[in-house]
Every structure is written in C-alpha cells, then in structure tokens.
C-alpha cells in the first residue's frame, strides 16, 4: 500500500531528481483461534525510490531488497508484502505446535508474542552520497526487543552500493581498529581497556571494524548495534572518525568521488 508521497530528494548525475516515497505493509495474526491467543505483528514502513528516479532509483531499490530481505528480481513493494506474509505464516506453522504444549501455562504466553518492525528513511550525506537508514526492531519471545540500525550507503550519481572495498585499502582493519578503540576511550573518558570493560564495553569481544556505518562528507560514522561490543544497556554506539584521521588507509579515488 502506498502510504505517503515524496520523502526526500537529491540530484543525480544527469541533473534529474532522485526522490523517495514511503511504502507500508503490515499484518497481525493470532497464534490460535482463542481470543487471548499470543499475537504476531509485522509492520514495515520503508522509503522507496520513485519511478521518476529512473534507473538510479531502480538500482537503489533492488539493493535495499537484497540487503534487507535477501531477495532478487522483485520490487520493493512486492518484497515487503511477501515478507509480511511469509513471516506470519512461518510464525503459525512453527510456533503453534509448541504453544499447544504450553497452552495451560499462562506464564509461558509471552514466549509466543512476536513482532517485527522496520522503519526507514533516507539522508543525503554528501553531494554525491545517500544513506538509506533502516531501523529494525523485533522480538521473538524475548524479554527485550532486539534493535538494529542498518545503514546502506549509495552513490546518488550512479545508484551503486558503496562497499568496503570502494572506501578502504586492503588490510585496513589493522589500522582502523586502534583508531576506533582510541575514539571509544575518548568518548568514555577513560585511558585503559580495563576501564572500558568496567563500564560494560568489550567484555567478551575485541574492538573490530563494523559492517554498519554511514558515509558522510568529511567523516564516517561507525555503528555498533546493542550488545555487539557492550552491554545491552549501552544501546547503539556510534563512533565518528574523520577522513583526515583515516587518510593512511582510505582510497584517494573514494575521497574524490565525494566531491
């Protein structure tokens, strides 16, 4: 279902207007026919490049479908509707037999309460780049919802997805990881790794270069979703590094492409 008109826009390389509209798909189903049966709710509200955005918009939508739904050869609206139906069908098929065994135990009802939500928007992050920002929140019987920010970076000039290999030289992690650790320490106002651990960071994992980041005009914002490098209570962690800080392992061609 088409939900809202133009969301945002920017110029493409041919002087055209790259515009987005909001699409919505959703459904709620009860696990059984009982009035107080556990519920599964799916809600997808997603930015979609319009037809007026041409081939560039088509490439962006196709990449979003692949990244978020692992599908190819289907439009975004169709992928959304298909995902909603499959998620709800899978919920009933897999959870109903288990629920029937636990039906008499009301303390276990929450184990069967499911929800899956995606909200997305777009942001022009430099003259030639766009970030597609998908926020995913889901719970499959957990006490706490799982929350994720999943950015997808694009060139507005071509619609191409920006990959790690477009930005960084080979072996960049060995130089980036120490910078990320240093920035995290500065953010938390500590001087040692032990002090970071005392604050709930890096207790079970070493610092690493995350797959999630937002390409900006002068910076990259690296994103760690809840529980990735810190306790759940810390929430989403963002570390911002400038291109000047990363100049030893950033490809010059990438920096030029931002101009």
Describe the role of every protein-language-model region:
Residues 10-259:
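Compositionally biased intrinsically disordered regions enriched in Thr/Gly
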Residues 1-8:
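Sec-dependent bacterial lipoprotein signal peptides
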